[in-house]
């Protein structure tokens, strides 16, 4: 028996919700923008194979790979429930660039833990599994946060709550929005992007941030796409992180002139997202970004929609 799980790319923060909002996205042309993990019966407790277009960026020692840590914490949780871990062989297909702002580590974590859970007939419930995913993400970025793993696992636009045992809940969004994702092909480390942020904020920035986030969530729930798009503004991170992203200011300016509703940094960058109301605008923005924002052959641009499914079982073979 084998199980393969695909976990999609995600946009952390979505500009307006620093560390509390995240959205899963999938290209409209059917390209798999995300990682896949296969788990099948093995002869030893754990063995790892790696594949995929970004396999060269992974550590050569399997024990340094985050999916090995996923296996360890999954084993810990099974032990607490008095359940036995099956000997298994895992294959990670790494299709996501590392340090891209597309939730690359979240893709590997979500695909690995979901596949492990499926392979063992789902002993952990959704929130237990999500808590483990946040723990693993924290191991990479230095603090537990869910704004990539929650949408990657659950799909859609997710708001982090962390109250009453609820880690996150889905916010209704606009299915007709196109999300143009542009990765320039350079790397920005999450730790560096966090270090650049101020330790304190001015009162007017805190008030503006609260107004934007509350306004955005209100507009999503009341079905006002124009208002929602206007509220996608970031006073917390983007003003400081722009300097890490060559060409971002020009890209945002062009996207607005071409008719995009909003443009922002995906996670800590360097990927940007641009929301467009119709496909013509999305294609125009995508073409410009391909010619002006992408810096090398590793970069790419995809026109996406919100991915409402999150991680899914795609079968038993890679």
From Swiss-Prot:
Biological or metabolic pathway of the protein: Amino-acid biosynthesis; L-threonine biosynthesis; L-threonine from L-aspartate: step 4/5
GO MF annotation list: ATP binding; homoserine kinase activity
Signal sequence bounds: none
Amino-acid positions noted as binding ATP in the UniProt annotation, renumbered to this chain: 97-107
GO CC annotation: cytoplasm
Protein localization: Cytoplasm
A Pfam family reported for this protein in Swiss-Prot or TrEMBL: GHMP_kinases_C
Top-level taxonomic group: Bacteria
Coiled-coil spans in chain: none
The entry's keywords: Amino-acid biosynthesis, ATP-binding, Cytoplasm, Kinase, Nucleotide-binding, Threonine biosynthesis, Transferase
Enzyme class: transferase
GO biological process terms, semicolon-separated: threonine biosynthetic process
Chief localisation class: cytoplasm
Family listed: Belongs to the GHMP kinase family. Homoserine kinase subfamily.
Role of this protein: Catalyzes the ATP-dependent phosphorylation of L-homoserine to L-homoserine phosphate.
Family matches, as NCBIfam families: PRK01212.1-4, thrB
Identification of the protein by name: Homoserine kinase
Species for this entry: Vibrio vulnificus (strain YJ016)
Gene that encodes it: thrB
């Amino acid at each position: 028996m084998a199980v393969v799980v695909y976990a999609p790319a995600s946009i952390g923060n979505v500009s307006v919700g620093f560390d509390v909002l995240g959205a899963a996205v999938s290209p409209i042309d059917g390209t798999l923008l995300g990682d896949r993990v296969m788990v099948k019966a093995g002869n030893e407790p754990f063995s790892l194979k790696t594949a995929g277009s970004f396999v060269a960026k992974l550590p050569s020692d399997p024990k340094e790979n985050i999916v090995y840590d996923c296996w360890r914490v999954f084993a810990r949780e099974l032990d607490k429930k008095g359940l036995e871990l099956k000997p298994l062989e895992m294959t990670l297909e790494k299709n996501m660039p590392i340090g891209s702002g597309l939730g690359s580590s979240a893709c590997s974590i979500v695909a690995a833990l979901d596949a492990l859970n499926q392979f063992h007939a789902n002993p952990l419930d959704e929130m237990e599994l999500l808590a483990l995913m946040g723990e693993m993400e924290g191991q990479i970025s230095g603090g537990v946060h869910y704004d990539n793993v929650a949408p990657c696992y659950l799909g859609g636009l997710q708001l982090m709550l962390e109250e009453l045992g609820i880690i996150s809940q889905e916010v209704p969004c606009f299915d007709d929005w196109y999300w143009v994702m542009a990765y320039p092909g350079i790397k920005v480390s999450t730790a560096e992007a966090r270090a650049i942020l101020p330790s304190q904020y001015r009162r007017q920035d805190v008030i503006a941030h609260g107004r934007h986030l509350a306004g955005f969530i209100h507009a999503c729930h009341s079905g006002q796409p124009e208002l929602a798009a206007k509220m996608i503004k970031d006073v917390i991170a983007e003003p400081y992180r722009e300097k890490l992203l060559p060409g971002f200011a020009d890209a945002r300016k062009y996207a607005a002139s071409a008719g995009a509703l909003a443009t922002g940094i995906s996670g800590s960058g360097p990927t940007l997202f641009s929301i467009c109301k119709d496909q013509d605008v999305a294609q125009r923005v995508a073409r410009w970004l391909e010619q002006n924002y992408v810096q090398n052959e590793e970069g790419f641009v995809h026109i996406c929609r919100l991915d409402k499914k999150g991680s899914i079982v795609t079968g038993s073979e890679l």
